[in-house]
Amino acid sequence: MKTPISVKETAYNADQAALDFPPGAEDGYWYLARNNHLYNQLKKNGLDESPILEVGCGSGIVVEFLRKQGLDCKGCDLSDQAAKKSPYLFLSTDANDMEESYRKKVKTLLLLDVIEHIEEPVPFLKKLQTSFPNLEYFVIAVPARKELWSNYDVFFGHFRRYDMKMLRQEMKEIGAKVLVMHYFFKLLYLPGWLTVKLLGKRNLQVGAPQSSFSKALNRIPAAMIRFSDWILPRQWWGSSLLTIVRINKQKG
């Protein structure tokens, strides 16, 4: 029987980190739109007041953004390939191995484009629930729709792209209550689908504008993405899927 790939084996190598987290990626339209969407969801659901840990923080783009908004957010990652040194980032670190005193403080865990890298995500999530005894919420974002599967997913070590049914089932298996679940990046679904169908592959390099002009230009599609996600029905397909779930603690 095939042995499942361990979680530690999913850490990014240098090539993956360079393509997914190039310097300046935080100013690209994709991260601008996702950061805004995430922050709005955290505030809307009252998760912006308590300690937050991003598991699989990569280069720390999300942590830096949320801290600028005044949130108490830190990050950890199994890899140290992409992130700059920061007192708020714990690199080459498994979340389950962080200091117990800190783990007891954390109320919310962010897993943003993380669990698709895990061959068996349910045991992975259950272990986090055990390691963080006062955990109340998971905020999870994943790549969506199997018809968008491409060379990008293969290169970055994805095991799957999700739909709502699949993600709901995993949340059910960990005993969590779904509070929010919806697709986002709806504006990117059709271009992504056409790219896969017509070209058979997509660009692996995440956009990272360098000049002030290109940074300003990236704000335009970011705003268009945010507007389309706001105005279109939640059931409409997007290239990503987000859920917020409450952890049901066992009594006794």
Identify the meaning behind each predicted range:
Residues P22-P23, F138-R160, M164-E170:
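Short, glycine-/aromatic-enriched active-site segment of Class I SAM-dependent methyltransferases
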Residues A176-K186:
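Conserved S-adenosyl-L-methionine
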